[in-house]
Amino acid sequence: LPPISLYIHFPWCIQKCPYCDFNSHAVKAGIPEHDYVDALLKDLRNDLSLLTAPRTVSSIFMGGGTPSLFSPEALDRLLAGIGQLLSLSEDCEITLEANPGTFESAKFREFRALGINRLSIGIQSFDDRHLKKLGRVHSAAEAIKAVEIAANAGFDNLNLDLMFGLPEQTEAEAIGDIQSAIALNPTHISFYQLTLEPNTYFYKFPPKLPEDEAIFAAQKACQQLLAEHGYRQYEISAYAKVGFQSRHNRNYWQFGDYLGIGAGAHGKITRALPHDIVRTAKPKSPEQYLKQTYPSASLRISSPSVEAIPVEQLPVEFAMNHLRLTNGFSLADYQRLTGLSPDTLEPALTQCLEQGLLVKQQQRIFCSDKGWDFLDVILEKFIR
């Protein structure tokens, strides 16, 4: 069976950003911390009934929303409860997402003392003008201060989230953001292009974005700068110093399993290969999530929140994840993780190799430089 991770979703934010299509809700009248932790542990207990064998969790990721809005006491109770229900690897990577507006020194020292060993800080830009347009509640100065607080609290594994292709952003401004991030010496940088997603304010009222050519040029210049400073790209939008790739995200991209608990969380669990891989989905509304009741374990597999992945869908699901990684996948991994013969990747695989979109080297398949820019085209071939 593949490695397994745990994703925990915290759906509350100080305010909803206009570009955000994640399941996040502005805090209106306080956060029901105690009830939510109870619900998370109940949810986890229930999901464990789907496992066909004991599994050891190699990473935990607390995402949102803004998980750092929760108190250290609430997260302590949550992590203690998880420790009683799950076996965690000795070097388990435990990540907490945090936004610069929520940083207090004492609070983050306590988070570190709980065993949280990686922080992911949602900075997005170091330019106050762009932060304002993005609806962020922090300033550039607060972003820099947050990184300082994190380092002083003992966090030596730190990701900074940044975006490019922002409304009216110039190439020089995008480069400036990357230079500011590098100067803070994080171990990992996530660098995403802003996209206008359905069901967001920006989608309804689109801001003026730079031309595609300008976005592409800015991206290439920033990538070069990251490489020069020791940040090696290992996924479409992820750059890490040696030894600091995100174990949790790598597990997603390598078609690993993950338990997903919390409002709107998704999971993937391999019960047996190739015919018994399931996806789980939880109610998106925090109110509904807090009220939900759980069927007995025997009914769990047929409940509406659990869906089997059809075998014919496995090739595209596998390719969709693995081809985001610079080193792609081996045909042996494909067989091991899906239970299917590499022949099931045809005819798409041969077509992509012939068109120079994919490269095959010693039984490894990965995107060519050209394919990297046409990932959507590659995936369409696997879908057909």
Regions found by a protein language model. Give the residues of each.
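Short amphipathic alpha-helical interaction segments
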Residues: G339-Q351
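A short, conserved structural fragment
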Residues: L353-Q363
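C-terminal scaffold of the Radical SAM
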Residues: P3-S5, S24-L50, T56-L340
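Local cysteine-cluster metal-coordination motifs and their immediate loop/turn environment
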Residues: P11-S24
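Short active-site neighborhood of thiol/selenol oxidoreductases, capturing the structured segment around
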Residues: L6-F10
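Minor-groove-contacting beta-hairpin "wing" of winged helix-turn-helix DNA-binding domains
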Residues: R364-S368
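Short, amphipathic alpha-helical interaction segments positioned at domain boundaries
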Residues: K370-R384
